[in-house]
Each structure stands twice: as structure tokens, then as C-alpha cells.
Amino acid sequence: MAELQVISTSRLRTAVRVSGDPDGIPVLLVHGNVSSSRFFDELMGLLPPLWYVLAPDLRGFGDSERLPVDARRGVGDYAEDLHSLVEAMGLAGTPVHLLGWSLGGGVAMQYAIDHPAQLASLTLVAPVSPYGFGGTKDAEGTPCFPDYAGSGGGTANPEFVKRLADRDAGQDSDFSPRNVMSAFYFKPPFHLEEERESAYVASMLQTAVGEDNYPGDLIPSANWPTVAPGKRGILNSLAAGNFNTVDIVDIDPKPPILWIRGDSDQIVSDTSLFDLGFLGQIGAVPGWPGVDIFPPQPMLAQTRAVLERYQTNGGRYEEEVIEDAGHSPHIEQPEAFLEAFVSSVRRNS
């Protein structure tokens, strides 16, 4: 059973779930957007007991301090927070195995760029594209517009944001966090048992809401869909123009990378239901300027192209696709996920 601790680092008070043997193989788990370390509860209980597993809540999530996010630095705030935790836990001189899920995948890539020698391996679970979320086209991440319109804080669904702020734990709307989790975090008809589902929803509702956190601010744009990324908050930290981890191809040393994704992910895919390019194409967002100007973002193709460059430059990576899973394969298909992840850590320890 993981123990929830609160660690005062040089940057903030960080809540972190801790399990296993402090003298064992160190493993860091970094959660995704609108979630917390609680989403790793089952996984932590299934990992080898001789591993030393740490799963922090990022700033503004879970039980960690609600500090603002400077999106002009991409996910730099989160990556530096993570490094301060590693230092506070006495692991700065020990290579760790770092896993990042979704937003956490972006944080993990930035951490690898900043501290490559500190990683024994890197596992990316349904990660954000190295070119960010929204506003780009083609495998090279070409911007659809110079101001990266179509990404950032202004692209969040306002009804979901309102219900998150209102701490709506019910299910009377498609935009209630509980229903959003069931419909998009997982591949329907997957459902958690009620107690665990409610615990996850409660952790979603701990998300700090506002321009400094979720979703962030916005800048009006003359380009479709009339919003461009702002400078504050979570969605802007992932927005094209602010976020870019392509430099991972040049890091030295190059830890081995395991890329794990579900075969039915609706959030990070080449046809994402959260990408305005795809939503415009299917008629869900009016005024779409067409496939030549704003096609669906090829998120998987972008990630694969960057990882291929990583491999060409002397690194190595594996792509593992988990069948019958959506955006959360570690929850939906824990046995298949464990087999891939545990094998990778053991090979590289």
C-alpha cells in the first residue's frame, strides 16, 4: 500500500505516494492532466516490492501546492519541480526509471532533456506529441498558423471547466468530470468499480482551476478558431509554440525509451476528439478552414518521427501498443501494461 507523504522541496510542497524498498530500484511515475498520483494506485500495488516507487502530484493537482504555471517555459515548471523532489528524496546521484503518462509524458521528455544522465530508462505512456497539443500539422510539426491558433487554454470546453470548478462529482451531464473520465480516459465500455471510480473523480476535482492553472489564459486570434495560446496555465504549457521537446533527439546519454499506448486512445491519436483540427473536419466545430490549412494533428506520427530520429542519433526505443485500451492502458489493461513496463525496467537496471 502506497503511503502519501508531503515533501517540502526547494520549490514547493509536493504530495508524493511512496511504496517499496528505499534501497531498491528507483522508479518515478508522473501523472497526466486533470488527474493525480491516485491514478497510479493499482499499478503501484502490482509493481515488484523491491522497487522504490515515487508518484508525485504535480503543482496544482492532487494534494500538492497550488502554484501558478508559467506556460512560456512549456512544462519547465513541472520538470524543475520533479527534479527538486528527486533531490529532496536523496536520489539526485542515482539513475532513476522515469514514467510519464499524457501530460506527464511531456514532463518526462523535458526532464530527459534537462537531466539525461539521471535516467536509467524513460517510459512514455500515451504522451503528448513532442510538438505539443493542437495547432500543428504533418509529422514535422509545422504550425497551422504563425500564432499557433487552435491550441492552448482557449480550447478547453467551458462547461467541463465550470463543472470542474464547481466540484461536480455527479453524472447528470456529458461534461461532468465523472462522465468525461469514463468516456475518454478509458475505452468504453470499460468501467471501474464504484469506490475506485469515485476516488479518481475526487482527485480530478482537486485540480486547481483558473488562468494560472487549468485551463489557463488565452489570446484572441484572427485565425480559426479565434483563440491562440496564452502565457499561463496547464493547457498553454502543452500548446504548440510554448511546448517543444524535439531536442530529446540530441540528448547525451540517451536512455532507452519505451512508448506505450492504447490502440483506442481518443485523446492522443491522429484523430483525437480533443483536437480542433479533427473536430472541425467532422463538422463539430464551425468555420473549419479545410484540410490544407488545419488538418487533424498527426500526434502519433509526430511522436514516432521524433523517436525514429532519436534512434538514428544513437538511442533506442520500442513502441508497445496495448490492445483494447484507451488513454489509460495502465488502468484498463494492467497485466499487459505490467509485462511491458516491468520487463523494460529490468532489462535496463
Regions found by a protein language model. Give the residues of each.
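Active-site loop/oxyanion-hole signature of alpha/beta-hydrolase fold enzymes
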Residues: 9, 58-99, 103, 113-114, ...
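Hydrolases whose catalytic domains are alpha/beta-hydrolase-1, hotdog thioesterase
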Residues: 107-111
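Catalytic active-site module of serine/aspartate enzymes centered on a nucleophile-bearing elbow/loop
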Residues: 275, 280-349
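Alpha/beta-hydrolase
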Residues: 142-302
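A short, hydrophobic beta-strand element of the alpha/beta-hydrolase
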Residues: 123-125, 130
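A short loop-to-beta-strand scaffold at the N-terminal edge of the catalytic core in hydrolase folds
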Residues: 9-19
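Hydrophobic beta-strand anchors of alpha/beta hydrolase catalytic cores
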Residues: 27-29, 53, 99, 257, ...
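Conserved HGGG/HGGXW glycine-rich cap/lid loop of the alpha/beta-hydrolase fold
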Residues: 17-71, 85
